Amino acid sequence: MFSPRKIPMNVRGISMANGPVLVVDFGAQYAQLIARRVREAGVYSELVPHSMPVDEILAKDPKAIILSGGPASVFEPGAPTIDTKVFESGVPVLGICYGFQVMAYELGGKVDKAALGEYGKTSATIDDAAGILADSPAEQTTWMSHGVAVEQAPAGFEVLAHTEGAPVAAMADESRKLYGVQWHPEVKHSPLGQKLIENFLHRCAALPNDWDASSIIEDQVKKIREQVGDAEVICGLSGGVDSAVAAALVHKAIGDQLTCVFVDHGLLRKGEVEQVKHDFVAATGIRLITVDAADDFLDALAGVSEPERKRKIIGEKFIRTFEKAQRQVLEEAGARGKEVKFLVQGTLYPDVVESGGGDGAANIKSHHNVGGLPKDIKFQLIEPLRTLFKDEVRAIGTELGLPDEIVWRQPFPGPGLGIRIIGEITKERLDLLREADAIAREELSKAGLDRDIWQCPVVLLADVHSVGVQGDERTYGSPIVLRPVSSEDAMTADWSRVPYDVLATISTRITNECRQINRVVLDCTSKPPATIEWE
């Protein structure tokens, strides 16, 4: 996983000022991952759709272009492609999988159905350890997923590698700075894949590694100050890392011009309310208004078991509560002769990509953590994290001096524990789940696993009664489900292989300390087919 330790911290300045690396998305499931890997190499990257006209692509002044994989076959009618002007532009281009085939096909190479499709782990023979394959061993373990192969490279290209099913598995035309590879260097199953990407960026395209947390902060602080001037700003804190880092970054830029609102809906994990009210404020000095609305939320949720209805009630209740606090902020600012003009949101780059948004989006995007903010708020948006992935946000939080407990907090849904109780939400059930969840998080942290696991939802099957024996007595309790998952972006996930001794400790503690729980079970399902959250 990308982490602050992996972000280069030796160079200030920011490569996006000199033009980004553009990742052209042909519908690949790994397109965002390619962009992340470029960032890990210390170079700023952006995703663009393959349908973007080539003149618009080149108008962005890209310093390099990467063509992603995709599900199509290049020789089928209507298959997505790219204008050959890209290859004639002088900009270094790397084609990956389908993007590699597009490059070969459009430049006159021979592409056809593979005699042998290759899926999964595949050994590649390196014919020339140069360019993108500089310093490569004679054989590489790679990750393939193709039923179409480049059988002959276009004129001017040198074959760098082959596999049993791909006569041309990697190629290069150094004179035009064009490169292609059939396997997926962006996935962890290609152990030397990151080295290939770094070779392309630093050796072939001669790009510096100047995308780092310090330069991002410096750049954003300058932009925020220019945007805000002497106006005042409001930010809704959800308790999650995104809104916390966004608020800390804006506060670094404008100080007391920022007021944060934290709505305690009573559905947070153990200690989180205190963490926001005390630790976050102590670390940042931010002015915070806390609204204790726990009883209001519980009253609104009484008797409700259906998951979508829970979400809707929580979202609507949050909006109404935030609006009330917002009026207080506006009145206080008015009394000082000030005007609140801006709203901070912790929008991340995946949110922008998945919503099809671009620069300068005017409408307020529904906040994925809190169920949506009022659509009629007359504020201008400040979204200081909208070019960043989650792990870059963590790096910035660390650089800003936020406590690890906030920066490394596991992702948590806006409806909170409300959608981790299968059944009606009551105060007693919330208290029970809160204790069990705290035990699981504490033991995972003790075992040093809290940064290896993306998140570990703890789910209370409140409407299920499990037979048990506790203290020589027959009991009917509720089962608890542990759902530890590993992921890079939450779009896909695998269940985490938590050591048995850690699981045993968690199970023993929960059943001993939470007497209404007599069974702990492990959810070992990947996403897909299952989602990370149960509701």
Curated annotation (Swiss-Prot):
Keywords associated with the record: ATP-binding, Glutamine amidotransferase, GMP biosynthesis, Ligase, Nucleotide-binding, Purine biosynthesis
Annotated InterPro entries: Class_I_gatase-like, GATASE, GMP_synth_C, GMP_synth_GATase, GMP_synthase, GMPS_ATP_PPase_dom, NAD/GMP_synthase, Rossmann-like_a/b/a_fold
Keyword Hydrolase included in the entry's annotation: no
EC number: 6.3.5.2
Protein name: GMP synthase [glutamine-hydrolyzing]
Classification via Pfam families: GATase, GMP_synt_C, NAD_synthase
Function: Catalyzes the synthesis of GMP from XMP.
Source organism: Bifidobacterium longum (strain NCC 2705)
Active site residues according to the UniProt entry: C97 (nucleophile), H184, E186
GO CC terms of this entry: cytosol
Protein's gene: guaA
Gene Ontology MF, one: ATP binding
Pathway: Purine metabolism; GMP biosynthesis; GMP from XMP (L-Gln route): step 1/1
Catalytic activity annotation: XMP + L-glutamine + ATP + H2O = GMP + L-glutamate + AMP + diphosphate + 2 H(+)
Binding-site positions, ATP: S238, G239, G240, V241, D242, S243, A244
Superkingdom as given in the UniProt entry: Bacteria
